[in-house]
Curated annotation (Swiss-Prot):
This is Thiosulfate sulfurtransferase GlpE. It is an enzyme of class 2 (transferase). Gene3D superfamilies: Rhodanese-like domain (3.40.250.10). The gene is glpE. Its main location: cytoplasm. The lineage of its organism: Bacteria, Pseudomonadati, Pseudomonadota, Gammaproteobacteria, Pseudomonadales.
Amino acid sequence: MTEFKRIPPEQAQALREQGAVLVDVRDPQAFESNHIPDSVHLDNHSIADFIREADLDKPLVVVCYHGNSSQSAAAYLVGQGFSDVYSVDGGFELWRTTYPQETVQG
């Protein structure tokens, strides 16, 4: 079984530019307040539909607050059949510091 990889925001941005799917596992209020453009909010209510509709071979980058919860989510997604999964070290907080222009509200 493939395992997920931990990556810094810079590598996540490179994957994003190459068409990877970004999923944000923070709570809905945090996502609404600020998130990475084109990222998908993923929670217990949306995960089944997301998995059913996803391309399991497309790179998938998981982001949370600080890079901890995203590791559990990434491991779960690997277990669901995704073959190319990444967890962003430092999470959205480090992303926002590294790429302040690459965040949106709403």
